[in-house]
Amino acid sequence: PSYGYRLSTSYTQMFEIGGQGKGNAELIWAIPVNTEAVSWNDWHMFVLPTDFADHGMTSGYECVNSTWYFYDSFEVNDVRKTYLVTSYKAQDGSIINRENPGLHLELGPIPLKYGYDINVTGNGGKSNIDPIIYRLADVYLTLAEALYLKPASSETDKEEAISYINTIRNRANLDEINSKDITTEE
C-alpha cells in the first residue's frame, strides 16, 4: 500500500523553495523551517564558498565539499547532478569553475543539494527550504536492496528489486538497468 505517497514528477523541485509541504506526496519526513520563527536550514551556509555571489545568494563557510570523482561517477543526464554546482560567479565578478577552480572548486563541486534561496545572504545562511530526511524514493531503494541481498534471494525477488530501482531511474531520466548491471553488493 502506498498510504498516499507517490514519487514527485520532478526530482529537483522537492529540494527547492515551495517544493516541500503537504503538496509533495513523496516526502515522508521533512523538518519544517521558518526563518521568521526559530528554525531554518543552515545547509547553504555550510557549503557555499566564502566568495560566492550568484543566484541572489552570498557567501558561506564552505565547511562541506564534494569531489570531482564523485561528480564524474554520475551518468551524463542524471538529474541528481543539478545541485552539484560546478560553476559560480564570485564576489569579484570572476567565474569560478572546473577549469578555473581557484581554492573553492579545486577538490570538487559545491554540494548545494537544496535549491537557490535568495534569503541566504552572508554566512548567516538562513534558508526556508525544509531539510528532507526521508522520502518515498528512499523506501523503494531500501526495499530493492533488501530483496536483492536477502539470503536465498530468488530471481523473482531480484526482478522486483530491479523494478523498484528502475522506477527511480525512470524519474531521473536514466536508462533502465537489468540484473547484469548489478555486479557487487556495494
Report the location of each language-model feature.
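Acidic/polar-rich alpha-helix caps and helix-coil junctions
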Residues: P1-N41, V76-E186
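Short intrinsically disordered coil segments
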Residues: W43-D51, P101
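Non-catalytic, low-structured ubiquitin/UBL-interacting segments
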Residues: Y71
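Short, cationic low-complexity segments
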Residues: L48-W68
